[in-house]
């Protein structure tokens, strides 16, 4: 028999942020490592181009995506990793997802001020 008033879960939005973070990490981080870790130090890409791109709306959107979503993925992994290890922190969901939310807000304001 079905319950008349099922309990709502916060898992779908959290899994959305987790999967977006994992996907963005897998796609963007190798490119960022190549550009910022190899090409820029070797002088093959001028720093001015990166600064100009970072000040455009698309650049700000990229900065937001590569900073916010991977944080959600990491915190989700830590939260569930601790659960798998039988380490149960009180209100761990509030702790990890709250820190991710706070981080997202701080990054949003920092990028807007850029």
From Swiss-Prot:
Pfam families to which the protein is assigned, alphabetical: Fumarate_red_D
Gene3D superfamilies the record matches: Fumarate reductase/succinate dehydrogenase, transmembrane subunit
SUPFAM superfamilies linked: Fumarate reductase respiratory complex transmembrane subunits (SSF81343)
Record-stated family: Belongs to the FrdD family.
Originating species: Haemophilus ducreyi (strain 35000HP / ATCC 700724)
Protein name per Swiss-Prot or TrEMBL: Fumarate reductase subunit D
Entry GO MF terms: succinate dehydrogenase activity
GO biological process: fumarate metabolic process
One Gene Ontology cellular component annotation held by this UniProt entry: fumarate reductase complex
Classification via HAMAP family: Fumarate_red_D (MF_00709)
Family annotation (CDD domains): QFR_TypeD_subunitD (cd00547)
Subunit record text: Part of an enzyme complex containing four subunits: a flavoprotein (FrdA), an iron-sulfur protein (FrdB), and two hydrophobic anchor proteins (FrdC and FrdD).
UniProt-listed InterPro entries: Fumarate_red_D, SQR/QFR_C/D
Keyword terms, alphabetized: Cell inner membrane, Cell membrane, Membrane, Transmembrane, Transmembrane helix
Membrane topology: Multi-pass membrane protein
Keyword Cell inner membrane part of the UniProt annotation: yes
Domain of life: Bacteria
Lineage, broadest ranks: Bacteria, Pseudomonadati, Pseudomonadota, Gammaproteobacteria, Pasteurellales
Main location: membrane
Alphabetical list of NCBIfam families matching this protein: PRK05470.1-1
Gene this chain is encoded by: frdD
Protein location: Cell inner membrane
């Amino acid at each position: 028999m079905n319950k008349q008033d099922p309990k709502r879960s916060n898992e779908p939005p959290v899994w959305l942020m987790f999967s977006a973070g994992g996907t963005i990490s897998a796609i963007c981080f190798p490119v960022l490592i190549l550009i910022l870790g190899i090409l820029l130090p070797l002088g093959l890409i001028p720093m001015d181009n990166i600064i100009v791109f970072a000040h455009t709306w698309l650049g700000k959107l990229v900065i937001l995506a590569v900073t916010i979503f991977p944080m959600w993925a990491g915190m989700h992994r830590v939260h569930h990793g601790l659960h798998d290890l039988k380490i149960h922190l009180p209100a761990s969901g509030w702790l990890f997802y709250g820190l991710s939310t706070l981080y997202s807000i701080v990054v949003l304001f920092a990028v807007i001020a850029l």
